[in-house]
Amino acid sequence: MSEESDSLRTSPSVASLSENELPPPPEPPGYVCSLTEDLVTKAREELQEKPEWRLRDVQALRDMVRKEYPNLSTSLDDAFLLRFLRARKFDYDRALQLLVNYHSCRRSWPEVFNNLKPSALKDVLASGFLTVLPHTDPRGCHVVCIRPDRWIPSNYPITENIRAIYLTLEKLIQSEETQVNGIVILADYKGVSLSKASHFGPFIAKKVIGILQDGFPIRIKAVHVVNEPRIFKGIFAIIKPFLKEKIANRFFLHGSDLNSLHTNLPRSILPKEYGGTAGELDTATWNAVLLASEDDFVKEFCQPVPACDSILGQTLLPEGLTSDAQCDDSLRAVKSQLYSCY
Protein backbone atom coordinates (compact mmCIF):
# COMPACT_ATOMS: atom_id res chain seq x y z
CA MET A 1 0.00 0.00 0.00
CA SER A 2 1.35 3.43 -0.89
CA GLU A 3 2.23 6.05 1.70
CA GLU A 4 -0.53 8.26 0.26
CA SER A 5 -3.24 5.61 0.72
CA ASP A 6 -1.93 4.81 4.22
CA SER A 7 -2.12 8.46 5.13
CA LEU A 8 -5.68 8.65 3.87
CA ARG A 9 -6.58 5.53 5.85
CA THR A 10 -5.09 6.62 9.17
CA SER A 11 -5.97 10.35 9.16
CA PRO A 12 -9.50 10.85 10.53
CA SER A 13 -11.79 13.09 8.51
CA VAL A 14 -13.67 15.99 10.11
CA ALA A 15 -16.90 14.06 9.62
CA SER A 16 -15.60 11.18 11.74
CA LEU A 17 -14.54 13.34 14.70
CA SER A 18 -16.80 13.54 17.72
CA GLU A 19 -18.16 16.97 18.72
CA ASN A 20 -15.55 17.32 21.46
CA GLU A 21 -12.74 16.50 19.05
CA LEU A 22 -13.69 19.08 16.42
CA PRO A 23 -11.09 21.80 15.98
CA PRO A 24 -12.22 25.15 17.40
CA PRO A 25 -13.66 27.62 14.88
CA PRO A 26 -11.25 30.31 13.77
CA GLU A 27 -11.44 33.46 15.86
CA PRO A 28 -12.63 36.63 14.13
CA PRO A 29 -9.80 38.88 13.01
CA GLY A 30 -8.63 41.23 15.72
CA TYR A 31 -8.61 45.00 15.55
CA VAL A 32 -6.22 46.52 13.04
CA CYS A 33 -5.65 50.26 13.37
CA SER A 34 -6.29 52.20 10.16
CA LEU A 35 -5.07 55.57 11.46
CA THR A 36 -2.16 57.32 9.79
CA GLU A 37 0.86 58.24 11.89
CA ASP A 38 -0.37 61.84 12.05
CA LEU A 39 -3.78 60.73 13.31
CA VAL A 40 -2.20 58.38 15.85
CA THR A 41 -0.30 61.40 17.17
CA LYS A 42 -3.46 63.53 17.15
CA ALA A 43 -5.41 60.85 19.00
CA ARG A 44 -2.65 60.65 21.61
CA GLU A 45 -2.58 64.42 22.13
CA GLU A 46 -6.32 65.18 21.98
CA LEU A 47 -8.00 61.95 23.08
CA GLN A 48 -5.43 60.46 25.48
CA GLU A 49 -5.25 57.38 23.24
CA LYS A 50 -2.03 55.43 23.65
CA PRO A 51 -1.52 52.76 20.97
CA GLU A 52 0.40 50.57 23.37
CA TRP A 53 -2.56 50.60 25.82
CA ARG A 54 -5.40 50.67 23.28
CA LEU A 55 -6.44 47.02 23.48
CA ARG A 56 -6.05 47.01 27.25
CA ASP A 57 -8.44 49.97 27.43
CA VAL A 58 -10.93 48.25 25.13
CA GLN A 59 -10.82 45.12 27.28
CA ALA A 60 -11.39 47.21 30.41
CA LEU A 61 -14.52 48.75 28.89
CA ARG A 62 -15.71 45.34 27.70
CA ASP A 63 -15.30 43.92 31.21
CA MET A 64 -17.27 46.84 32.68
CA VAL A 65 -20.16 46.25 30.27
CA ARG A 66 -20.27 42.54 31.09
CA LYS A 67 -20.17 43.20 34.82
CA GLU A 68 -22.52 46.18 35.14
CA TYR A 69 -24.89 45.55 32.21
CA PRO A 70 -24.75 41.80 31.57
CA ASN A 71 -28.09 41.79 29.71
CA LEU A 72 -27.31 44.71 27.43
CA SER A 73 -27.60 43.66 23.80
CA THR A 74 -24.59 45.38 22.27
CA SER A 75 -21.58 44.67 20.15
CA LEU A 76 -18.41 44.21 22.16
CA ASP A 77 -16.05 44.24 19.21
CA ASP A 78 -12.83 46.19 19.63
CA ALA A 79 -13.63 48.60 16.81
CA PHE A 80 -17.13 49.32 18.12
CA LEU A 81 -16.05 49.98 21.71
CA LEU A 82 -13.24 52.23 20.51
CA ARG A 83 -15.84 54.68 19.20
CA PHE A 84 -17.04 55.31 22.73
CA LEU A 85 -13.60 55.46 24.30
CA ARG A 86 -12.45 58.03 21.74
CA ALA A 87 -15.59 60.12 22.15
CA ARG A 88 -14.90 60.34 25.90
CA LYS A 89 -11.12 60.64 25.75
CA PHE A 90 -10.54 57.14 27.12
CA ASP A 91 -12.33 57.83 30.40
CA TYR A 92 -13.76 54.36 31.13
CA ASP A 93 -16.72 55.50 33.23
CA ARG A 94 -17.81 58.19 30.79
CA ALA A 95 -17.37 55.84 27.83
CA LEU A 96 -19.54 53.23 29.55
CA GLN A 97 -22.25 55.81 30.27
CA LEU A 98 -22.14 56.97 26.66
CA LEU A 99 -22.56 53.38 25.45
CA VAL A 100 -25.55 52.83 27.75
CA ASN A 101 -27.07 56.17 26.71
CA TYR A 102 -26.58 55.25 23.06
CA HIS A 103 -28.68 52.12 23.43
CA SER A 104 -31.18 53.78 25.76
CA CYS A 105 -31.82 56.51 23.20
CA ARG A 106 -32.43 53.95 20.50
CA ARG A 107 -34.97 52.16 22.69
CA SER A 108 -36.72 55.34 23.85
CA TRP A 109 -37.33 56.85 20.39
CA PRO A 110 -38.51 54.00 18.16
CA GLU A 111 -40.02 56.42 15.62
CA VAL A 112 -36.48 57.44 14.73
CA PHE A 113 -34.34 54.37 15.32
CA ASN A 114 -36.55 51.41 14.43
CA ASN A 115 -36.09 50.14 10.88
CA LEU A 116 -33.34 52.70 10.32
CA LYS A 117 -32.02 51.85 6.87
CA PRO A 118 -31.29 53.82 3.68
CA SER A 119 -34.07 52.25 1.61
CA ALA A 120 -36.64 53.48 4.14
CA LEU A 121 -35.45 57.07 3.65
CA LYS A 122 -35.29 57.38 -0.11
CA ASP A 123 -37.68 60.35 -0.12
CA VAL A 124 -35.52 62.30 2.32
CA LEU A 125 -32.33 61.46 0.47
CA ALA A 126 -33.88 62.41 -2.87
CA SER A 127 -35.02 65.77 -1.48
CA GLY A 128 -31.45 66.93 -0.92
CA PHE A 129 -32.16 67.70 2.74
CA LEU A 130 -28.66 66.61 3.71
CA THR A 131 -25.41 65.39 2.25
CA VAL A 132 -21.73 65.09 3.13
CA LEU A 133 -19.32 67.23 1.15
CA PRO A 134 -16.66 65.25 -0.75
CA HIS A 135 -13.75 67.15 0.84
CA THR A 136 -12.84 67.45 4.51
CA ASP A 137 -11.91 70.73 6.17
CA PRO A 138 -8.26 71.57 7.04
CA ARG A 139 -8.59 69.67 10.33
CA GLY A 140 -9.79 66.55 8.55
CA CYS A 141 -13.43 66.94 9.60
CA HIS A 142 -16.17 65.74 7.26
CA VAL A 143 -18.70 68.50 6.54
CA VAL A 144 -22.35 67.51 6.90
CA CYS A 145 -24.51 69.93 4.90
CA ILE A 146 -28.14 70.30 6.05
CA ARG A 147 -30.71 72.29 4.08
CA PRO A 148 -34.08 72.50 5.89
CA ASP A 149 -35.61 74.45 3.01
CA ARG A 150 -35.58 71.24 0.95
CA TRP A 151 -38.07 69.64 3.32
CA ILE A 152 -41.78 69.85 2.42
CA PRO A 153 -43.75 69.07 5.62
CA SER A 154 -46.74 67.71 3.71
CA ASN A 155 -44.53 65.00 2.19
CA TYR A 156 -43.31 63.38 5.41
CA PRO A 157 -42.92 64.23 9.14
CA ILE A 158 -39.88 65.96 10.60
CA THR A 159 -38.79 62.73 12.29
CA GLU A 160 -37.82 61.40 8.86
CA ASN A 161 -35.25 64.20 8.58
CA ILE A 162 -33.91 63.27 12.00
CA ARG A 163 -33.67 59.64 10.91
CA ALA A 164 -31.64 60.69 7.87
CA ILE A 165 -29.27 62.69 10.08
CA TYR A 166 -28.62 59.74 12.38
CA LEU A 167 -28.26 57.42 9.41
CA THR A 168 -25.52 59.69 8.08
CA LEU A 169 -23.79 59.96 11.46
CA GLU A 170 -23.84 56.19 11.92
CA LYS A 171 -22.16 55.76 8.56
CA LEU A 172 -19.56 58.46 9.21
CA ILE A 173 -18.61 57.16 12.64
CA GLN A 174 -17.59 53.81 11.17
CA SER A 175 -14.43 55.58 10.01
CA GLU A 176 -11.62 55.81 12.54
CA GLU A 177 -10.59 59.04 10.87
CA THR A 178 -13.96 60.56 11.78
CA GLN A 179 -13.77 59.19 15.31
CA VAL A 180 -10.55 61.15 15.82
CA ASN A 181 -11.19 64.29 13.75
CA GLY A 182 -14.91 64.74 14.36
CA ILE A 183 -17.36 66.47 12.03
CA VAL A 184 -18.50 69.96 11.10
CA ILE A 185 -22.12 70.83 10.38
CA LEU A 186 -23.05 73.41 7.74
CA ALA A 187 -26.73 74.37 8.11
CA ASP A 188 -28.33 76.51 5.41
CA TYR A 189 -31.56 78.10 6.67
CA LYS A 190 -32.34 79.97 3.48
CA GLY A 191 -36.09 80.10 2.86
CA VAL A 192 -37.12 78.50 6.16
CA SER A 193 -40.60 79.79 6.94
CA LEU A 194 -42.34 80.35 10.24
CA SER A 195 -44.68 77.40 9.71
CA LYS A 196 -41.77 75.09 8.92
CA ALA A 197 -39.71 76.27 11.90
CA SER A 198 -42.60 75.60 14.28
CA HIS A 199 -42.25 71.85 13.66
CA PHE A 200 -38.98 71.89 15.61
CA GLY A 201 -40.37 72.44 19.10
CA PRO A 202 -38.73 71.91 22.52
CA PHE A 203 -39.85 68.28 22.67
CA ILE A 204 -37.91 67.33 19.55
CA ALA A 205 -35.09 69.82 20.13
CA LYS A 206 -34.27 68.42 23.56
CA LYS A 207 -34.26 64.83 22.33
CA VAL A 208 -32.06 65.54 19.30
CA ILE A 209 -29.57 67.64 21.25
CA GLY A 210 -29.56 65.23 24.18
CA ILE A 211 -28.64 62.35 21.89
CA LEU A 212 -25.97 64.28 20.00
CA GLN A 213 -24.35 65.50 23.23
CA ASP A 214 -24.73 62.49 25.51
CA GLY A 215 -25.94 59.54 23.46
CA PHE A 216 -23.86 59.29 20.32
CA PRO A 217 -20.08 58.77 19.92
CA ILE A 218 -19.44 61.73 17.63
CA ARG A 219 -17.27 64.81 18.08
CA ILE A 220 -19.03 67.91 16.72
CA LYS A 221 -16.26 70.45 16.21
CA ALA A 222 -18.34 73.31 14.78
CA VAL A 223 -21.83 74.24 13.55
CA HIS A 224 -21.86 76.91 10.85
CA VAL A 225 -25.26 78.48 10.13
CA VAL A 226 -25.72 80.49 6.94
CA ASN A 227 -28.60 82.42 5.39
CA GLU A 228 -30.55 82.33 8.63
CA PRO A 229 -33.75 84.44 8.59
CA ARG A 230 -34.92 86.55 11.50
CA ILE A 231 -36.91 83.67 12.92
CA PHE A 232 -33.67 81.82 13.59
CA LYS A 233 -33.34 83.87 16.76
CA GLY A 234 -36.46 82.07 17.94
CA ILE A 235 -35.14 78.70 16.78
CA PHE A 236 -31.85 79.24 18.57
CA ALA A 237 -33.72 80.37 21.69
CA ILE A 238 -35.39 76.94 21.69
CA ILE A 239 -32.09 75.11 21.22
CA LYS A 240 -29.70 77.05 23.45
CA PRO A 241 -31.06 76.02 26.89
CA PHE A 242 -30.29 72.40 26.04
CA LEU A 243 -26.76 73.03 24.78
CA LYS A 244 -23.71 72.51 26.94
CA GLU A 245 -21.46 75.55 27.04
CA LYS A 246 -18.72 73.87 25.02
CA ILE A 247 -21.13 73.04 22.20
CA ALA A 248 -22.90 76.40 22.35
CA ASN A 249 -19.54 78.10 21.82
CA ARG A 250 -19.07 76.11 18.62
CA PHE A 251 -22.10 77.68 16.91
CA PHE A 252 -21.22 80.34 14.33
CA LEU A 253 -23.96 82.43 12.70
CA HIS A 254 -22.80 83.91 9.41
CA GLY A 255 -26.02 85.23 7.88
CA SER A 256 -25.48 85.90 4.18
CA ASP A 257 -21.82 86.83 4.72
CA LEU A 258 -20.04 84.01 2.93
CA ASN A 259 -16.67 85.68 3.50
CA SER A 260 -17.24 85.05 7.19
CA LEU A 261 -17.95 81.39 6.43
CA HIS A 262 -14.79 81.15 4.34
CA THR A 263 -12.60 82.12 7.30
CA ASN A 264 -13.64 78.79 8.82
CA LEU A 265 -14.33 76.60 5.81
CA PRO A 266 -12.07 77.35 2.83
CA ARG A 267 -13.60 77.97 -0.56
CA SER A 268 -11.65 75.03 -1.99
CA ILE A 269 -13.87 72.50 -0.17
CA LEU A 270 -17.20 74.30 -0.61
CA PRO A 271 -19.62 74.00 -3.54
CA LYS A 272 -20.38 77.10 -5.56
CA GLU A 273 -23.72 77.50 -3.73
CA TYR A 274 -21.64 78.69 -0.77
CA GLY A 275 -19.08 80.70 -2.68
CA GLY A 276 -16.76 77.75 -3.12
CA THR A 277 -14.71 76.38 -5.99
CA ALA A 278 -15.52 72.66 -5.60
CA GLY A 279 -18.26 72.59 -8.22
CA GLU A 280 -21.99 72.26 -7.70
CA LEU A 281 -23.39 70.68 -4.55
CA ASP A 282 -23.53 66.94 -5.15
CA THR A 283 -26.04 64.91 -3.14
CA ALA A 284 -26.11 61.81 -5.36
CA THR A 285 -22.66 60.52 -4.36
CA TRP A 286 -23.38 60.44 -0.63
CA ASN A 287 -26.83 58.95 -1.24
CA ALA A 288 -25.13 56.14 -3.16
CA VAL A 289 -22.73 55.53 -0.26
CA LEU A 290 -25.65 55.18 2.14
CA LEU A 291 -27.71 52.96 -0.14
CA ALA A 292 -24.72 50.68 -0.63
CA SER A 293 -24.67 50.18 3.16
CA GLU A 294 -28.20 48.77 3.32
CA ASP A 295 -27.19 45.34 4.62
CA ASP A 296 -25.15 46.81 7.48
CA PHE A 297 -28.08 48.93 8.67
CA VAL A 298 -30.56 46.05 8.35
CA LYS A 299 -28.31 43.94 10.57
CA GLU A 300 -27.87 46.68 13.17
CA PHE A 301 -31.23 48.47 13.27
CA CYS A 302 -33.88 46.13 11.87
CA GLN A 303 -33.70 43.22 14.31
CA PRO A 304 -36.09 42.53 17.23
CA VAL A 305 -35.03 44.20 20.48
CA PRO A 306 -34.36 41.62 23.23
CA ALA A 307 -36.85 41.87 26.09
CA CYS A 308 -34.03 42.08 28.61
CA ASP A 309 -33.04 45.44 27.16
CA SER A 310 -36.03 46.94 28.95
CA ILE A 311 -33.74 47.31 31.97
CA LEU A 312 -32.24 50.34 30.32
CA GLY A 313 -33.58 53.53 31.80
CA GLN A 314 -35.17 56.23 29.71
CA THR A 315 -32.15 58.35 30.56
CA LEU A 316 -32.44 61.04 27.93
CA LEU A 317 -36.21 61.39 27.57
CA PRO A 318 -37.22 65.03 27.93
CA GLU A 319 -38.82 65.55 31.31
CA GLY A 320 -42.39 66.79 31.31
CA LEU A 321 -42.72 66.55 27.53
CA THR A 322 -44.06 63.07 27.03
CA SER A 323 -47.75 63.51 26.31
CA ASP A 324 -49.30 64.73 23.08
CA ALA A 325 -51.10 67.51 24.91
CA GLN A 326 -47.85 68.79 26.37
CA CYS A 327 -46.25 68.69 22.91
CA ASP A 328 -49.13 70.75 21.50
CA ASP A 329 -48.69 73.31 24.28
CA SER A 330 -44.97 73.45 23.53
CA LEU A 331 -45.62 74.12 19.84
CA ARG A 332 -48.03 76.91 20.67
CA ALA A 333 -45.33 78.47 22.82
CA VAL A 334 -42.82 78.05 20.00
CA LYS A 335 -45.06 79.82 17.52
CA SER A 336 -45.46 82.74 19.92
CA GLN A 337 -41.70 82.88 20.32
CA LEU A 338 -41.12 82.81 16.57
CA TYR A 339 -43.76 85.45 15.86
CA SER A 340 -41.91 87.78 18.23
CA CYS A 341 -38.92 87.68 15.87
CA TYR A 342 -40.86 89.56 13.20
Swiss-Prot record:
Pfam families: CRAL_TRIO, CRAL_TRIO_N. InterPro entries: CRAL-TRIO_dom, CRAL-TRIO_dom_sf, CRAL/TRIO_N_dom, CRAL/TRIO_N_dom_sf. CDD domains: SEC14. Residues 1-31 are annotated as: Disordered. Residues 8-19 have a biased composition (Polar residues). GO terms for molecular function: phosphatidylinositol bisphosphate binding. Residues 117-282 form the CRAL-TRIO domain. GO terms for cellular component: membrane. Keywords: Transport. The keyword Acyltransferase does not apply. May act as a protein that binds a hydrophobic ligand. This is Alpha-tocopherol transfer protein-like. The lineage of its organism: Eukaryota, Metazoa, Chordata, Craniata, Vertebrata.
